[in-house]
From Swiss-Prot:
One of its GO terms (molecular function) is sulfate adenylyltransferase (ATP) activity. It catalyses: sulfate + ATP + H(+) = adenosine 5'-phosphosulfate + diphosphate. Its EC number is 2.7.7.4. It holds the Pfam family PUA_2. SUPFAM superfamilies: Nucleotidylyl transferase (SSF52374), PUA domain-like (SSF88697). It comes from Psychrobacter sp. (strain PRwf-1). This is Sulfate adenylyltransferase. Belongs to the sulfate adenylyltransferase family. Keywords: ATP-binding, Nucleotide-binding, Nucleotidyltransferase, Transferase. InterPro entries: ATP-Sase_PUA-like_dom, PUA-like_sf, Rossmann-like_a/b/a_fold, SO4_adenylyltransferase_pro, Sulfurylase_cat_dom, Sulphate_adenylyltransferase. PANTHER family: PTHR43509, SULFATE ADENYLYLTRANSFERASE. One of its GO terms (biological process) is sulfate assimilation.
Length: 419
């Protein structure tokens, strides 16, 4: 669906509505309601959240997972895992690509009954919210992993998370107390869906492309974003601020590098930088669908989907995350993919290009990837000038110079990143 068709479908001055709802459904308490709920929660039984569950809870709180009202029950878990469809309640039949679940030990689950309230506590002890128990249930973890990640190998970081989670899932509606450290650690870029929607309205943007990133932006990323600017009113560079895998570059370094790129190489008022609180799942195609779905809640009409979106290692083909959008119902969600082919620097063209636009043989191409860039920098290798802008490279070099060589995580080139 083109940006023009989306505008026509939504109305002349509309931003894309939230997924499955006419309005955002944030679950974050404020004011007196928050004070009272926090006071009551101190005397409740507690479930300690994993990092992934904490990020999911915050997304529920800020409306990023609209229209969900909490962690999924067994029927919804099964429907999402097998059919990418919710099966119960007001959201029955709604598209959802990845299960959003809470787990605990069998011992604790045995002590819970429907209707019980349980405090949800971060690993540092902060009470993040409460859940009203609907049910507890066990799952086939290997089945979830095979369906969502297409593998059960525990070398896959997303599979490892699922296999290590608690034995029993706890379903129920939640009330959220906190957005964690994100608003204070990243005050310039951390934004809720309500805040990005307001920003888009102020800029009079109707069609917005989200660019998902967990890396500093190199020349291929810059090229993808500029293609999107030609098609849409604006681009939101949306950085993941939650947990990553070893060897990935911290969010504060990425924030500085991306700001420098925007300030020096993008036209004013065509792009904004924002951040969101999730951890990476590395679910490849399924995660690309989730990325598009919650970007709809943030107000984005499009998601840029390039090579190996949300991938890790060699678990997915370079364009599997594009192909999966053709496998779902066309009305599954409103946010549409901007599918862009393999991009690279061409020495013959003396410019960035793609396999669709460049007539020259592969010997002229310099294929750029975030993994290649991280590997070169972590090993103090020379980085070709066509990999990244010099101002960005300097920020990244400064970061790696601050880490002793023996403390740097090994970066391996496998799968699409090695090509």
């Amino acid at each position: 669906m083109t940006s023009q068709k989306i505008v026509k479908r939504l109305g002349k001055t509309s931003i894309v509505p939230p997924h499955g709802s006419d309005e955002l459904k944030p679950l974050l308490l404020e004011g007196e309601a928050l004070s009272q709920a926090l006071h009551n929660a101190k005397n409740l039984p507690k479930i300690t959240l994993s990092s992934r569950e904490r990020g999911d809870l915050i997304m529920l709180g800020i409306g990023g997972f609209t229209p969900l009202d909490g962690f999924m029950n067994q029927a919804d878990w099964q429907g999402v895992v097998d059919e990418m469809t919710l099966k119960t309640g007001a959201n029955k039949g709604l598209f959802w690509p990845i299960p959003i679940t809470l787990s605990t030990s069998k011992e604790q689950a045995d002590s819970l009954a429907p209707g019980d309230e349980v405090a949800l506590v971060a690993e540092d002890g902060e009470i993040m919210g409460v859940i009203t128990v609907e049910e507890t249930y066990t799952i086939d973890k290997a089945h979830e992993c095979q369906q969502v990640f297409t593998t059960t190998e525990e070398e896959h970081p997303g599979v490892k998370q699922v296999m290590e989670q608690g034995e029993v899932n706890v379903a129920g509606a939640v009330k959220v107390f906190s957005q964690g450290e994100f608003p204070t650690l990243y005050p310039e870029i951390y934004k809720t869906p309500a805040e990005t929607r307001k920003l888009f309205e102020e800029k009079n943007w109707q069609t917005i492309a989200a660019f998902q990133t967990r890396n500093p932006m190199h020349r291929s990323h810059e090229y993808l974003a500029k293609i999107a600017i030609e098609i849409c009113d604006g681009v939101m560079i949306h950085s993941l601020l939650g947990a990553l895998k070893p060897g990935d570059i911290p969010a504060e370094v990425r924030q500085e590098a991306i700001k420098t790129l925007i300030d020096n190489y993008f036209k004013k008022d065509t792009v904004i930088q924002a951040g969101y609180p999730l951890d990476m799942r590395y679910a490849g195609p399924r995660e690309a669908l989730l990325h598009a779905l919650f970007r709809q809640n943030y107000g984005c009409s499009h998601l840029i989907v390039g090579r190996d979106h949300a991938g890790v290692g060699d678990y997915y083909g370079p364009f599997d995350a594009q192909a999966i959008f053709d496998e779902i119902d066309k009305d599954a969600m409103l946010t549409q993919p901007l599918k862009i082919d393999w991009t690279f620097w061409c020495n013959a063209c003396q410019a960035m290009a793609s396999t669709k636009t460049c007539p020259h043989d592969a010997e002229h191409h310099v294929k750029v990837s975030g993994t290649k860039l991280r590997k070169a920098l972590s090993e103090d290798q020379e980085v070709p000038e066509n990999f990244s802008r010099p101002e960005v490279l300097q920020i990244l070099r400064n970061y790696y110079e601050s880490i002793a060589k023996e403390d740097r995580a090994e970066v391996k080139l496998v799968g699409a990143s090695a090509q």
